[in-house]
């Protein structure tokens, strides 16, 4: 069977999802799980983007073993230098350099000629080869590029030493039969194509990223670039779990090294750390992917799951457990269930999570997996508590002006404020904003029930923006929805401070 390389770009292209801001520790946590998933290549980031991004890529390169660790760089020496400095300690480093090749990008964005772009691409690959034997070249907006120019530039960069050539559908414009045909024609016309791996990178603007990727694979692509849960700019990227499971379920003749039993754990980890909720009807990993409401379907599944399920849930690692957790459950049972759900917490975080679990168990008769995931997501969101909620009291009701009294701890000092609002949450947020004088704006607030029942956990989500328009997301859970709302607001503010400082 033909080997298919899985290139995961969750930490680079996936992190460009609006509202996603991962810190170094969170990126490392995801990278380690991607290594367990057994992806072939991890694109760890874009080192030139910021000092924090550089440190995150460097940390991953130094600590994650197994996959190739790639760093993105524009086709300019400064970017390539920075990329190499970040990944040089990896046991398998790759520099991934790119330049746009479509006429609209060349003329409008780059303000160059085709010849100048060709020269810059070749120079960049030669420059990268001085550092690294494994160099990937991407022709940005390849789908809208002139075919003959694509052939010319790919032949030139392969001669310059590129080991991988990548054909991106940057704006998600292609249709599956068109994209597959493009890959086939490129393979037929690039004279030195046998010296490089052909890669594809599909965006989902028309909802066709997975279909386009599969079409490319059956037409000769040997590497597919994708993200967990389909994260990415605009409508996202091709979802890794969809591509892999399509190949596995349909028994396509390609060798894929992914450990599919790690898919569910990886999906949940990425969702919890990025704060991007998986849509319920998302293929493979959505909450409803294995749910059946129709009576006819339910009857069939009870008799034989294969009547309506083409994938065994165990195949992607969805845990099956008969253990019911409650207030009498001990730490061992709690930790075992965490491991089944894909979480591995260090001792201090495990202790804090277990403490929260026991507090919740005193309020709820039965603890569900969703409750546990909600609790643990608060523990693994590795953001320092610059501001900590010490006290919260709200007075509200019919005929009463909602009033919030809060005490927040900052560097050991307590700040007390009182504010009124249009409702209890509004009053709390005004009190927090009064106590913490950091320029920001509230962009969005939502509240949902994690599970059913009057004793359910409520999950609050807050989006804040700074003066530059950057988005920071905070989430928190509690059986008290006002408390959850306050904690979510503070977590978003703490993330802002962590990334931007208090100025």
Curated annotation (Swiss-Prot):
Sites binding Mn(2+) sit at: 13, 201, 203, 237
Where do the segments described as Regulatory domain lie?
Answer: 388-503
**Which GO BP terms, alphabetically?**
L-leucine biosynthetic process
Which Gene3D superfamilies does the annotation name?
Answer: 1.10.238.260, 3.30.160.270, Aldolase class I (3.20.20.70)
- Superkingdom of the organism of origin: Bacteria
Catalytic activity of the protein: 3-methyl-2-oxobutanoate + acetyl-CoA + H2O = (2S)-2-isopropylmalate + CoA + H(+)
Give the Enzyme Commission number.
Answer: 2.3.3.13
The cellular location(s) given in this protein's UniProt record come to: Cytoplasm
Q: Name one Pfam family in it.
A: HMGL-like
Please list the cofactors this protein needs: Mn(2+)
Give the record's GO CC terms: cytoplasm
Q: Which CDD domains match?
A: DRE_TIM_IPMS
InterPro entries, sorted? 2-IPM_HCS-like, 2-isopropylmalate_synth_dimer, AIPM/Hcit_synth_CS, Aldolase_TIM, LeuA/HCS_post-cat, LeuA_allosteric_dom_sf, LeuA_bact_synth, PYR_CT
Q: List the disulfide bonds.
A: none
Keyword set, alphabetical order: Amino-acid biosynthesis, Branched-chain amino acid biosynthesis, Cytoplasm, Leucine biosynthesis, Manganese, Metal-binding, Transferase
- Which pathway does the UniProt entry assign to this protein? Amino-acid biosynthesis; L-leucine biosynthesis; L-leucine from 3-methyl-2-oxobutanoate: step 1/4
What positions does the domain Pyruvate carboxyltransferase occupy?
4-264
Task: Show the GO MF annotations.
Answer: 2-isopropylmalate synthase activity; acetyl-CoA C-acetyltransferase activity; manganese ion binding
Q: Which family does it belong to?
A: Belongs to the alpha-IPM synthase/homocitrate synthase family. LeuA type 1 subfamily.
Main function: Catalyzes the condensation of the acetyl group of acetyl-CoA with 3-methyl-2-oxobutanoate (2-ketoisovalerate) to form 3-carboxy-3-hydroxy-4-methylpentanoate (2-isopropylmalate).
Q: How does it assemble?
A: Homodimer.
Name by which UniProt lists this protein? 2-isopropylmalate synthase
